[in-house]
Design a protein with these regions (language model features):
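Expand to "…catalyze enediolate/carbanion chemistry for C-C bond making/breaking, isomerization
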Residues: 1-161
Length: 161
């Protein structure tokens, strides 16, 4: 589970993703919002870093997924089923969703670590498509939070590498 942020801007992030990952982002955003809204059956994923990084900022995740949908539609990717699920969840939960920025958003170093580790991971997933992100592999900001992770998860701060 992951919400890829190769840019601090959701619209730019959406435009940078390959179609496979772009479409997957829409589903994963629904799953994350579902967990954060307490609507998910069972307790799975509630402690996953991709869920925790958006806790309290569900409206920001909503904006992110809307950017993914707009980009997907522009590529001819069908999103109707996921959109229906998202809209139903929004209708039920909008008033309880938080609008605070994630903890990393206003910290330049943390934001650069998030963006850079996401670019490096995308490069690893598809080096041909993400060749323009190859530089991220050697960036000083490509420093995952711990030795077990590929990403910088703000939620893991304080763990030993």
């Amino acid at each position: 589970m992951q919400t890829f942020l190769p840019s601090a801007n959701a619209t730019i992030s959406a435009s940078m993703l390959d179609s496979k990952r772009l479409n997957k982002q829409i589903l994963e955003c629904y799953q994350i919002l579902n967990v954060l809204s307490g609507k998910s059956k069972g307790g799975g994923w509630r402690n996953h870093p991709a869920v925790l990084m958006w806790k309290g900022y569900e409206k920001g995740l909503w904006k992110y997924v809307q950017a993914m949908i707009v980009e997907a539609r522009s590529r001819g990717i069908r999103t109707e089923n996921n959109e229906a699920n998202l809209n139903n969840l929004k209708d039920l939960c909008w008033d309880i969703w938080g609008d605070n920025p994630p903890s990393f958003w206003n910290d330049k170093t943390k934001l650069m670590r998030v963006v850079t580790t996401h670019k490096a991971s995308l490069f690893d997933k598809d080096p041909m498509f993400y060749a323009r992100f190859g530089y991220a592999k050697h960036s000083i900001y490509n420093s995952p939070c711990c030795s077990k992770c590929k990403y910088y998860w703000v939620t893991h701060e304080g763990r030993n590498a």
